[in-house]
């Protein structure tokens, strides 16, 4: 159960990185997102069901056989989300080069892209 919770938490963190968690600064380098009203985090309504499938391969590097697992949910989530968006918009040749990708930024990229040949 602990490993499943770590995977869920890591995936939610990756989703937040890709879509929500923007840390902005003004022209004087002061943070613009200083509270959770401005710095958005994903909550249960924004999340898809997350399935976890675990395979047990104990470590031989320590006496308990334990390994870290939480990061394995975080690292691929943002890449998978951004790749999925780019794939959905492949006819427009949209390339996303920064995260998080906001709806407004995504609209800008689509509007600036070449229209698909019809």
Task: Locate predicted features.
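C-terminal catalytic domains of large/alpha subunits in multi-subunit enzymes
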Residues: 1-118
């Amino acid at each position: 159960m602990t490993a499943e919770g770590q995977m869920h938490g890591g995936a939610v963190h990756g989703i937040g990185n890709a879509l929500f968690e923007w840390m902005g600064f003004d022209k004087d380098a002061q943070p613009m997102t200083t509270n959770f009203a401005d710095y958005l985090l994903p909550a249960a309504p924004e999340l898809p069901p997350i399935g976890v499938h675990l395979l047990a391969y104990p470590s031989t590097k320590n006496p308990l056989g334990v390994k870290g697992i939480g990061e394995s949910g975080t690292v691929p989530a943002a890449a998978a989300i951004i790749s999925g968006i780019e794939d959905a918009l492949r006819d427009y040749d949209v390339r996303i080069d920064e995260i998080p990708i906001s709806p407004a930024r995504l609209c800008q990229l689509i509007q600036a892209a070449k229209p698909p040949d019809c």
